[in-house]
Amino acid sequence: MERTFLMVKPDGVQRGLIGEVITRFERRGFKMVASRFEKLPDARVMEHYAEHVQKPFFPGLKAYITSGPCFLMVWEGKDIVKISRDMIGATNPAGAAPGTIRGDYALEIGMNVIHGSDSVETANREIAIHFKPEELVSYTRIDEQYLYE
């Protein structure tokens, strides 16, 4: 089964949206295999956003991500990377469709509630940055027989 990394960012945490995010993914049939609530250290933010460190917007992004706690999660399911990106919506909330997390809850591109891995490769890298292998829990949902052919 495919895995992805999701993170409810500080604005989503402060606005009480963790439960909403979890509910949407559970109802879709995906299962959470790891989670942690923490304020991210600078070094890990720089590792996570390594491709953006030299960009002019990075200092603001780093200040925002470290401004409060985040809720980090690893989810598992068939085609979860693509489907989760569709559920999250466009990075810029102005272009995010209604019914997506960002379309329903985000107002600014800089504070857009949630991060989700954009490819299987990125998901594997981000999961390894934030979680040790032994922190990922393997289990079978009772309804899996009704979710997958």
Curated annotation (Swiss-Prot):
Q: Enumerate the active-site residues.
A: 115
The cofactor required is: Mg(2+)
GO terms for biological process, alphabetical: CTP biosynthetic process; GTP biosynthetic process; UTP biosynthetic process
Question: Where is this protein localized, as stated in its record?
Answer: Cytoplasm
EC no. given is 2.7.4.6
InterPro entries, sorted:
NDK-like_dom, NDK-like_dom_sf, Nucleoside_diP_kinase, Nucleoside_diP_kinase_AS
Pfam families listed in its UniProt record = NDK (PF00334)
The answer to whether keyword Ribosomal protein applies is no
Q: Report the GO terms under cellular component.
A: cytoplasm
Asked if Cytoplasm is a keyword of the record, the answer is yes
Catalysed reactions, as listed in the record: a 2'-deoxyribonucleoside 5'-diphosphate + ATP = a 2'-deoxyribonucleoside 5'-triphosphate + ADP; a ribonucleoside 5'-diphosphate + ATP = a ribonucleoside 5'-triphosphate + ADP
Q: Which SMART domains match?
A: NDK (SM00562)
Annotated Gene Ontology MF terms?
Answer: ATP binding; metal ion binding; nucleoside diphosphate kinase activity
User: Which EC class is the enzyme in?
Assistant: transferase
Keywords on this record? Answer: ATP-binding, Cytoplasm, Kinase, Magnesium, Metal-binding, Nucleotide metabolism, Nucleotide-binding, Phosphoprotein, Transferase
The record's section on HAMAP family has: NDP_kinase
Task: List the NCBIfam families.
Answer: PRK00668.1
Q: What does this protein do?
A: Major role in the synthesis of nucleoside triphosphates other than ATP. The ATP gamma phosphate is transferred to the NDP beta phosphate via a ping-pong mechanism, using a phosphorylated active-site intermediate.
What's the protein here called? Nucleoside diphosphate kinase
